Amino acid sequence: MSDTLIGLVSQYSPSGEERRAVEWLVERMKSLGYGESFIDEAGNAVGVMGKGSKQVILLGHIDTVSGEISVREENGILYGRGAVDAKGPLACFVDAVASVGVQDGWQFVVIGAVEEERNSEGARFVAQKYKPDFAIIGEPNRWDRIALGYKGSAWANVIVKREQAHTASREETAAEIAVDVWLKIKAYVSEFNEDKKRVFDQLLLTLRGMDSGQDGFEQSATLKVGARLPVEVSPEDWYQKLEGIV
């Protein structure tokens, strides 16, 4: 199994705490013969091979979700945070470019981007800085196929507030109203997906959390709503629909 993969997965790097992993990867690329390896202004790890006029960007992300997992190999399977999402693809990029080496007319740029699991700050910086001829994004969609696109992710907080009422009152609580709103959102999404056979074309909805409380004067309830958007639904369209439902 690749030393790059094992070494990279061994560097615990949840979003916002990637620096140690970034420094490790920069040194790893240097040792593999990259012409340049450095940390860019956004904190991304960058390795450059070749100086040709045609540029290929191989972009992965070096951060992970939180929750450290002991790194171990069992029966040819590597366990550890980020082994799949997405240090596996990133390590493949690093080793593949090192194996290919310098090619006449080409420049390969491998980037381990930061903050992907948050606001994609690393990738946003890359999008502004580079204008490559080709870009390949490393994500866990199996080794034997190529994904042509990914859904966008849209998050929203739906907040319900109302005056405090006596607990024996028939008035609905803020929490009850929030539940009604959630059921209406689900009903809309179910109707939208009814004739969509491909998952890629569907709206994928999740209730990421719900909080409620009161201060003696006012009740409040918050729905934390997540959605994976198909191509035909822009973030603006989705947020407008949510506001309409509310």
Predicted regions mapped to residue ranges:
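Acidic/histidine-rich catalytic neighborhood of metal-dependent amide-processing enzymes
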Residues: 91-155
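Active-site metal-coordination/substrate-binding segment of hydrolases
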Residues: 53-112, 130
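Short coil/turn motifs at secondary-structure junctions
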Residues: 63-65, 115-117, 163, 230-232
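Short glycine/serine- and small hydrophobic-enriched flexible loop segments
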Residues: 7, 95-102, 180-187
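Metal-dependent amide/peptide-bond hydrolase catalytic core
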Residues: 10, 14-20, 36-38, 154-246
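N-terminal helical capping/dimerization or prosegment-like subdomains
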Residues: 1-57, 65, 220-227, 237-241
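Short beta-strand/turn micro-motifs at beta-sheet edges
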Residues: 68-69, 144-148, 210-215
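Fold-independent oxyanion-binding glycine-rich loops
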Residues: 41-42, 60-62, 114, 138-141, ...
